[in-house]
Curated annotation (Swiss-Prot):
GO molecular function, one term: DNA binding
Keyword DNA damage belongs to the record: yes
Cited HAMAP family: UvrC
Cellular localisation: Cytoplasm
GO CC entries: cytoplasm; excinuclease repair complex
Alphabetical keyword list: Cytoplasm, DNA damage, DNA excision, DNA repair, Excision nuclease, SOS response
Function per UniProt: The UvrABC repair system catalyzes the recognition and processing of DNA lesions. UvrC both incises the 5' and 3' sides of the lesion. The N-terminal half is responsible for the 3' incision and the C-terminal half is responsible for the 5' incision.
Organism lineage string: Bacteria, Pseudomonadati, Pseudomonadota, Alphaproteobacteria, Rhodobacterales
Domain GIY-YIG: 34-112
Source organism (scientific name): Jannaschia sp. (strain CCS1)
Stretches assigned to the UVR domain: 222-257
Protein name according to UniProt: UvrABC system protein C
């Protein structure tokens, strides 16, 4: 929002001795008016405790100025408040949007916080090629084509793509691979592709298959089946038995796909079904994605809540943060009403550009969908609480085995991956009381040009130096949860000696670290543990703590290998076009599709280059000069 907010009363009124929180707040109330806006409560270290919105700032903030009558959570928040900040807005809807944006940015201690907010994958049917590709897509929708989603997970997308390939025989290869084929690939042999790369299907027939696939993704499967059945009958009457058999197989495959999808609500075309279950100061929100009358998967979320927060407040905070960077669907079906229903409708409708309907259904098919989501939320939270309890016992055991002061809340495990020093990547995974914190995982592209190929010590030094130098810069007072309580390093005495040197150089002497080595005969179960200045030790083969350490080490190894493969794959697919100024991914695809290879692009003249869609005369000149200046 530009030019629609202004800061007011950011400085507390002049006071003498330190006042209780409710008196500090009362001093601010006298400076406020009845404008809508957002308020922030800060502690004595200027850390944000809470972000809230208000239709009338003066009235809302005044409710905190009472010395009693608050819930335990609010009472603690008021007690810790040393100052406040305010932003006025033109409308309460703007205040809601600003509030949720600040909560995600500042992560205040007393707010409900959505901790896992990754983007969701979509299916893209591209239209930049005569034979469009169908593929999984995540991120901004810059590429031309039709997008379908969101899907709850990559697995849900992959299953749908497999089904579409079975039914419609569409290609999933890249344009560069498509242009380079001289014979059909294995997918053609197993009847998962129609072989357009080698002319086994005409552009017209392939286009018809693409249109059918798009109709299926839009939910028109009943009409599509009827059309295919009519086509099969017409082909039989015309004695085109091969075509009739192909249509029969497509109808069968389409029927199998529909029966395998499970939940397929007929009365709900486009909606997110969102249900909340709270228990023991914890919460689970279950989201089902219904698109084109089909269930495109579900995802569970575990927002940070307090014991005395009510369901409407939790659900409102979840919706605001969940749709902050996502377009909402036409309908939201909720298990509980939210605190500001009309306000949320206005905010989400503004984001979508058309009316968004929010319902709390009590009967019928929609209520059954919500009940199913609520049941899933309850069961998921039960499993999560059991896992957290078991994880807590393992962390207690880890503290006992390694002589820590208490169970670690954040364990960081480090590993490197490379092939003789090439495409080297460092990896960090994070574990805590709630299991693996995958949103906290980090990969480090090794930049050390002076490193000897395969120098694991040098790679570890670079990774840890970058990690802790950043921590020291961003959080020198250890105020956030980003600082680890324990480091696990893949390696023995040499690695631990190198780590100690790094930590000494950085002045970090309060983070314990342990080296994990596989022992003299490299057998799993005979791991040896190294601590600086102490004897090597081992755990019993059947010790649950040993299995726990092995799982964390294996997870770090898996993540490191995945990062290494991605880096290597990117390097393999690199071409000289990557270095041409003004040529991004889209124009690179267009050039390769038109010419077939980077070498052909390098040989092209200016008129050939300008014939490519999206290549202007100026860019064509840059491309031509780039390759001919190098010649």
């Amino acid at each position: 929002m530009k030019n629609e907010t202004e800061a007011v009363a950011d400085q507390p009124p002049k006071t003498g001795p330190v006042k209780p929180g409710h008196e500090v707040i009362a001093d601010y109330v006298r400076t406020l008016d009845m404008s809508p806006g957002v308020y922030r409560m800060l502690d004595s270290q200027s850390r944000v405790l809470y972000v809230g919105k208000a239709r009338a700032l003066k009235r809302r903030v005044a409710s905190y100025a009472k010395p009693s009558g608050h819930s335990p959570r609010i009472a603690r928040m008021i007690r810790d408040t040393a100052s406040m900040m305010f932003l006025t807005t033109r409308t309460e809807t703007e205040a809601l949007l600003l509030e949720q944006n600040l909560i995600k940015q500042l992560k205040p201690k007393f707010n409900v916080l959505l901790r896992d907010d990754k983007s969701f994958p979509n299916i893209l049917v591209s239209d930049e090629h005569a034979f469009p590709q169908i593929k999984k897509h995540r991120g901004s929708k810059k590429e031309k084509g039709s997008y379908f989603g969101p899907f709850a997970s990559a697995g849900a997308v992959n299953r749908t793509l497999n089904q579409l390939q079975k039914v419609f025989l569409l290609r999933n290869c890249t344009d560069a691979v498509f242009e380079s084929r001289t014979r059909p690939c294995l997918l053609y042999q197993i009847k998962r592709c129609s072989g357009p790369c080698v002319g086994h299907i005409s552009e017209e027939d392939y286009g018809a298959s693409v249109k059918d696939a798009v109709r299926f993704l839009k939910g028109d499967s009943t009409d599509l089946q009827r059309q295919l059945a009519d086509g099969m009958a017409a082909a039989s009457e015309a004695m085109e038995f091969e075509r009739a058999a192909a249509l029969r197989d497509r109808i069968r495959a389409l029927t199998n796909v529909q029966s395998a999808q499970g939940i397929n609500p007929q009365g709900v075309k486009e909606a997110d079904v969102i249900a909340l279950h709270m228990e023991g100061g914890q919460a689970c929100v279950q989201v089902f994605f219904i698109r084109a009358n089909q269930n495109w998967g579900n995802r569970d979320f575990y927002p940070r809540v307090g014991a005395d927060i009510e369901e409407p407040e939790v659900l409102e905070a979840f919706l605001g943060q969940f749709y902050d960077q996502k377009e909402p669907p036409k309908q939201l079906l909720l298990s509980h009403p939210v605190e500001s229903m009309d306000l949320m409708v206005d905010a989400l409708s503004g984001k979508r550009g058309t009316k968004v309907e929010i319902l709390v259904p009590q009967r019928g098919e929609k209520a059954e969908l919500v009940d199913g989501a609520r049941r899933n939320a309850r069961e998921s939270l039960g499993r999560k609480m059991a896992e957290t309890q078991a994880q807590g016992k393992l962390l207690d055991g880890l503290a006992g085995a390694f002589g820590l002061d208490g169970p670690p809340k954040r364990v960081e495990v480090y590993d490197n991956s490379h092939i003789q020093g090439a495409h080297a990547v460092g990896a960090m995974i994070v574990a805590g009381p709630e299991g693996y914190l995958k949103s906290q995982y980090r990969k480090f592209n090794i930049k050390g040009g002076s490193l000897t190929p395969g120098d694991d010590f040098g790679m570890m030094k670079e990774v840890l130096t970058r990690r802790f130098a950043r921590l020291l810069k961003e959080d020198p007072d250890r105020e956030t949860e980003a600082w680890p309580d324990l480091l696990l390093i893949d390696g023995g005495a040499g690695q631990i000696s190198a780590v100690k040197e790094i930590m000494d150089d950085l002045g970090v002497d309060d983070v314990p670290f342990i080296g994990v080595a596989k022992g003299i005969d490299r057998d799993q179960g005979k791991e040896e543990f190294y601590r600086p200045g102490q004897p090597v030790f081992a755990l019993k083969r059947n010790d649950p703590v040993l299995y726990f350490v092995q799982r964390m080490r294996d997870e770090a190894h898996r993540f490191a290998i995945g990062a290494h493969r991605a880096k290597r794959s990117k390097a393999v697919s690199a071409t000289p076009l990557d270095d041409v100024p003004g040529v991004g991914a889209g124009r690179k695809r267009a050039l390769l599709a038109h010419f077939g290879s980077a070498k052909a692009v390098a040989r092209a003249n200016l008129s050939d280059l300008t014939a490519v869609d999206g290549v202007s005369e100026g860019l064509a000149q840059k491309i031509y000069d780039f390759f001919h200046d190098q010649a």
